[in-house]
C-alpha cells in the first residue's frame, strides 16, 4: 500500500536563514565579495556574500555572472554613485528584510533600489511613500472639512442630505481618498428647498459665496501628479500666507459679480454655486488662512520681515511697459514674452574673460570655479584641496584608487587618467599648439602653459617666499627655492649618492654618468648635456655678449664670467687655500692650485671662504684660519722671494696682468726654471699682488719699500 506524500514546511526557516546570514556577515565569516562605496571623497568597504547580493539585486547578479572567477580570490566591486550610509541601509535590508531610515531618506533609498535593481526594496519604499502622501492629503481634507463645517453652521440654512449623484459633474474621485466624504457645503447648494422666497434665496446665496468649494478638483489633480514615484507633496509654507490671501481677495471680488436674479430657479442657483466652487484661489486661501491662524506672533513677525525683503528684491526686475515688478528674472522674461510679445535677449557674459553662457547659473558656476582661487573641498586621504566636489571625486579615483580606466595613447601606448589628459598628450606627437601669445607669438599646447608664459610680459609673480620675500612665476619654483632655506635635498643620485633640491637637477646630473648629451649645436654639431649650456654656446657663433663690465667695458657671454671679472677691479679674493693661505678670485683656480699640495685629497678640503664666512657647498660654515698666521706666512714667502732674488723663477706671465694675478703661484713658479721673463714685468706683477694683500697684514709697506730698493 502506497503512502501519500506530505508537505513539510517551516514558516520560521526563511527568517532564521536571513538571521544566520546576517550574523555571518557581521562577523566577516564566509564573505566572498568586498563592495567599495565611494561618494564625494567618502569611502568605505563592505564585506558580503555573493549569493545573498545576487539573489536580491539584479545588478550584482549580472556583475557576478559576467566576471571571470578565480579560485581563492575575493571579488571587489566599486560603487561611485551611492552614498555610504544608503548602501549600509541597503545591506541591512537585504540581510534582515527591514531597515529604519529617516523620512527624508526614503526617496534616496528608492533611488538606490532602482540603481541596484532591488525589487523588494523598491516596492517597499514606494508603498511607504504612498502612505506618507495619503496622510498629507488626509490632513488637507480635514482642514477643508473643518472650515466648511464652521461656515455652514453659521449660515443657518436648512438642508437635506443630497444624493451622491449630485456631485458627479466633477468627475470620478480618487479611490480610497474621497469616496466616503460628504461635504455640508455641497448639501446646502444642491439640496436647497424650492419653496423659499426669492429674496431669501438671494440672501442665502450671498452668504454661500463665502464658502469655499469642496476640494474634489484639487485632490484629483494632486492624485494625478502623485502617480509618479519621484514627486514630493508639501504643505505650503506659512510665509506665503499673506501673498495668497491677497489672491483670495481678488478671486472673491470676481465671484461677487455673479448675482442671482429674483426669478431664478434653485437649480440655476446650484449650477452657479458649482462655478463659484471652481475658483482654486478661494480654496488655497482658505486652507492657508486656517494654517496662518495656528502660527504664533513670532512667525507673523518673520513673515512681515520676509515680505519686506521680498518687496525690495522685486525692484530688481521691473517691466518697463506695465511697471509690474518681479522677484525672479525668469518670471520677468516670461511675462515680457507672453504678455507684451517682447522677446528680450539676455546675454550672460563673464566680465573677466568675456565668455558667454546659456543661463545665469552656468555663469555663476564659471565665475566661482574658474576665476576664483578658493578651494573649499579637501581630499580626506592626502589633504589636497579642490574647487569642486567632482574634482575631489576624480582625484580620489585617479590618484588613490589606481587610476581606474586608463586611456591609452595610440602612438606610444602611454596610459592617461582621462580623455582630456590623453588629448593634451597627443599634442606632443602631433606638434599641435593652438594657444598663442599675443605679445611675442609663442605658442603652447595647453592653456595653463600660456597663462604661465604671459607672466613674463606682465611681470606678475604671485608666489612669494615667506623667508626672504623672493617672488616667482610658478609654484614649483617657489618650492625649489624654499629648499635653499631648509637645506632639503630629497632627490639622490643612485650612482654616486649626491643629493639635489629638484628632480630637474638630478636629471641633468645623471647625464654625467650616462654620458648623454641630447642638445646639439646646429652650426658646429657640438653636443651638450644641458639645454642652458647649448644656449651659452650658441652665443659663440652669434657673437652675442650681453654682459658688459661697467668699469672697463669688457663683454662676456655668461653672467658668472662677468662676476669673476669684476673681482679684478674690486680686488676681492674670497676663496683661500688653507694649506698655504693663498687667495683666489674663483673656485676653479683654487681647485687647480690644490693639486700642488695633494692630488689625492678632495680640493674642497682646502677651501676656505674668507669673505663674511658664508656657507660652503656642503651647507656647513668653514672656520677661517688665524689671520695673523696667514699674514705672517704670506709675508715670509714674499720676503724670501725678495731677498733671494728669485723673481725669474715665477710662472710665465700670460697676456694680461690680471690673468697672472689669478694663476701665478710661488710653489708652481719654482718648477718653471726655464721660463725667461723680464725683470720689470715680474716686479710689477709682484707689487700688484702685494698691494692687494695690504689689508691682511700691517708689514706690507715695509716689504714694498724693500722691493723698491732692490729695483
UniProtKB/Swiss-Prot annotation:
Q: Explain the induction of this protein.
A: By GDNF.
List the residue ranges of the region (Disordered): 153-220, 243-312
Q: What is its main location?
A: cytoplasm
Any one Pfam family match given in the protein's UniProt record, by short name:
BTB
- Which terms under GO biological process does the entry name? branching involved in ureteric bud morphogenesis; negative regulation of DNA-templated transcription; negative regulation of transcription by RNA polymerase II; regulation of DNA-templated transcription
Where in the cell does this protein reside? Cytoplasm; Nucleus, Nucleoplasm; Nucleus, Nucleolus
In the UniProt record, does the keyword Zinc occur?
yes
The answer, when asked if DNA-binding is one of the entry's keywords, is yes
Instruction: List all Basic and acidic residues biased stretches.
Output: 197-212, 243-252, 265-277
Return the GO cellular component terms, semicolon-separated: cytoplasm; nucleolus; nucleoplasm
Q: What Gene3D superfamilies does UniProt report for this protein, alphabetically?
A: Classic Zinc Finger (3.30.160.60), Potassium Channel Kv1.1, Chain A (3.30.710.10)
Task: Give the domain of life.
Answer: Eukaryota
Q: Which residues carry this modification: Phosphoserine?
A: 613
Question: Molecular function terms in GO for this entry?
Answer: DNA-binding transcription factor activity, RNA polymerase II-specific; DNA-binding transcription repressor activity, RNA polymerase II-specific; RNA polymerase II cis-regulatory region sequence-specific DNA binding; sequence-specific DNA binding; zinc ion binding
**Which keywords appear in this protein's UniProt record, sorted alphabetically?**
Cytoplasm, Disease variant, DNA-binding, Dwarfism, Metal-binding, Nucleus, Phosphoprotein, Repeat, Repressor, Transcription, Transcription regulation, Zinc, Zinc-finger
Annotated Acidic residues bias:
298-309
Could you tell me which SMART domains the record lists for this protein?
BTB, ZnF_C2H2
Cite the InterPro entries for this sequence. Answer: BTB/POZ_dom, SKP1/BTB/POZ_sf, Znf_C2H2_sf, Znf_C2H2_type
- Describe, from its UniProt entry, the tissues in which this protein is expressed: Expressed in adult brain, heart, skeletal muscle, kidney and liver. Also detected in fetal brain and kidney, and at lower levels in fetal lung and liver.
**Feature: compositional bias, Low complexity:** 153-168
- Residue ranges constituting the BTB domain according to the UniProt record: 31-103
**Start and end residues, zinc fingers (C2H2-type):** 317-340, 348-371, 377-400, 407-429, 435-457, 463-485, 491-513, 519-541, 547-569, 575-597
Similarity comment: Belongs to the krueppel C2H2-type zinc-finger protein family.
Biological role stated in the UniProt entry: Transcriptional repressor that binds the GZF1 responsive element (GRE) (consensus: 5'-TGCGCN[TG][CA]TATA-3'). May be regulating VSX2/HOX10 expression.
Subunit structure as annotated in this protein's UniProt entry: Interacts with NCL.
Q: Which protein are we looking at?
A: GDNF-inducible zinc finger protein 1
Q: Look up and give the organism this protein is from.
A: Homo sapiens
Gene name per UniProt:
GZF1
Amino acid at each position: 500500500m502506497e503512502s501519500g506524500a506530505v508537505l513539510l514546511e517551516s514558516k520560521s526557516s526563511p527568517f532564521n536563514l536571513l538571521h544566520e546570514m546576517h550574523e555571518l556577515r557581521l562577523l566577516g565569516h564566509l564573505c566572498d565579495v568586498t563592495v567599495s562605496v565611494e561618494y564625494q571623497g567618502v569611502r568605505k568597504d563592505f564585506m558580503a556574500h555573493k549569493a545573498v547580493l545576487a539573489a536580491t539585486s539584479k545588478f550584482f547578479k549580472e556583475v557576478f555572472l559576467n566576471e571571470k572567477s578565480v579560485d581563492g580570490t575575493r571579488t571587489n566591486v566599486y560603487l561611485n554613485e551611492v552614498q555610504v550610509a544608503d548602501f549600509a541601509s541597503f545591506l541591512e535590508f537585504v540581510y534582515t528584510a527591514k531597515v529604519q531610515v529617516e523620512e527624508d531618506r526614503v526617496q534616496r533609498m528608492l533611488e538606490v533600489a532602482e540603481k541596484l535593481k532591488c525589487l523588494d526594496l523598491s516596492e517597499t519604499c514606494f508603498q511607504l511613500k504612498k502612505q506618507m502622501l495619503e496622510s498629507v492629503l488626509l490632513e488637507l481634507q480635514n482642514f477643508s472639512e473643518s472650515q466648511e463645517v464652521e461656515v455652514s453652521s453659521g449660515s443657518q440654512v436648512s438642508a437635506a442630505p443630497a444624493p451622491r449623484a449630485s456631485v458627479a459633474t466633477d468627475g470620478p474621485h480618487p479611490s480610497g481618498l474621497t469616496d466616503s466624504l460628504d461635504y455640508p457645503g455641497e448639501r446646502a447648494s444642491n439640496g436647497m428647498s424650492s419653496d423659499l422666497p426669492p429674496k431669501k434665496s438671494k440672501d442665502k446665496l450671498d452668504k454661500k459665496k463665502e464658502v469655499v468649494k469642496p476640494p474634489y478638483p484639487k485632490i484629483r489633480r494632486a492624485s494625478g501628479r502623485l502617480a509618479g514615484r519621484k514627486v514630493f507633496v508639501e504643505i505650503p509654507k506659512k510665509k506665503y500666507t499673506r501673498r495668497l490671501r491677497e489672491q483670495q481677495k481678488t478671486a472673491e471680488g470676481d465671484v461677487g459679480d455673479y448675482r442671482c436674479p429674483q426669478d431664478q430657479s434653485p437649480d440655476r442657483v446650484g449650477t452657479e454655486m458649482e462655478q463659484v466652487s471652481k475658483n482654486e484661489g478661494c480654496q488655497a486661501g482658505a486652507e492657508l488662512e486656517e494654517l496662518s491662524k495656528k502660527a504664533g506672533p513670532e512667525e507673523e513677525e518673520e513673515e512681515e520681515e520676509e515680505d519686506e525683503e521680498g518687496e525690495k528684491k522685486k525692484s530688481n526686475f521691473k517691466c518697463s511697459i506695465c511697471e509690474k515688478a518681479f522677484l525672479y528674472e525668469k518670471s520677468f522674461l516670461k511675462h515680457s514674452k507672453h504678455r507684451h510679445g517682447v522677446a528680450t535677449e539676455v546675454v550672460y557674459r563673464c566680465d573677466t574673460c568675456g565668455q558667454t553662457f546659456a543661463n545665469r547659473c552656468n555663469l555663476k558656476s564659471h565665475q566661482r570655479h574658474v576665476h576664483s582661487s578658493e578651494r573649499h573641498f579637501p581630499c580626506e586621504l592626502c589633504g589636497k584641496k579642490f574647487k569642486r566636489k567632482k574634482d575631489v571625486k576624480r582625484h580620489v579615483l585617479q590618484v588613490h584608487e589606481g587610476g581606474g580606466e586608463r586611456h591609452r595613447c595610440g602612438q606610444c601606448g602611454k596610459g592617461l587618467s582621462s580623455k582630456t589628459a590623453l588629448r593634451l598628450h597627443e599634442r606632443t606627437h602631433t606638434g599641435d599648439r593652438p594657444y598663442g601669445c599675443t605679445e611675442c607669438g609663442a605658442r603652447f599646447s595647453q592653456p595653463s602653459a600660456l597663462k604661465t608664459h604671459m607672466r613674463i610680459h606682465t611681470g606678475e609673480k604671485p608666489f612669494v617666499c615667506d623667508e626672504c620675500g623672493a617672488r616667482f612665476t610658478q609654484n614649483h619654483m617657489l618650492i625649489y627655492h624654499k629648499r635653499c632655506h631648509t637645506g632639503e635635498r630629497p632627490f639622490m643620485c643612485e650612482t654616486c649618492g649626491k643629493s639635489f633640491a629638484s628632480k630637474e637637477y638630478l636629471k641633468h646630473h645623471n647625464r654625467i654618468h650616462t654620458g648623454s648629451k641630447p642638445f646639439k649645436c646646429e652650426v658646429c654639431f657640438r653636443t651638450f648635456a644641458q639645454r642652458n649650456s647649448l644656449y651659452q654656446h650658441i652665443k659663440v657663433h652669434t657673437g652675442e655678449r650681453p654682459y658688459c663690465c661697467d668699469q672697463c667695458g669688457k663683454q662676456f657671454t655668461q653672467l658668472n664670467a662677468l662676476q669673476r671679472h669684476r673681482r679684478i677691479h674690486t680686488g676681492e679674493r674670497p676663496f683661500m687655500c688653507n694649506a698655504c693661505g693663498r687667495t683666489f678670485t674663483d673656485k676653479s683656480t683654487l681647485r687647480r692650485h690644490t693639486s700642488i699640495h695633494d692630488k689625492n685629497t678632495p680640493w674642497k678640503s682646502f677651501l676656505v671662504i674668507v669673505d663674511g664666512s658664508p656657507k660652503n657647498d656642503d651647507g656647513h660654515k668653514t672656520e677661517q684660519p688665524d689671520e695673523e698666521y696667514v699674514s705672517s706666512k704670506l709675508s715670509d714667502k714674499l720676503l724670501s722671494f725678495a731677498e733671494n732674488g728669485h723673481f725669474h723663477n715665477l710662472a710665465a706671465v700670460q697676456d694680461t696682468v690680471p690673468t697672472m694675478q689669478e694663476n701665478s703661484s710661488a710653489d708652481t713658479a719654482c718648477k718653471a726654471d726655464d721660463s725667461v721673463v723680464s725683470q720689470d714685468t715680474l716686479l710689477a706683477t709682484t707689487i700688484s699682488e702685494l698691494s692687494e694683500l695690504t689689508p691682511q697684514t700691517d708689514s706690507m709697506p715695509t716689504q714694498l719699500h724693500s722691493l723698491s730698493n732692490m729695483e
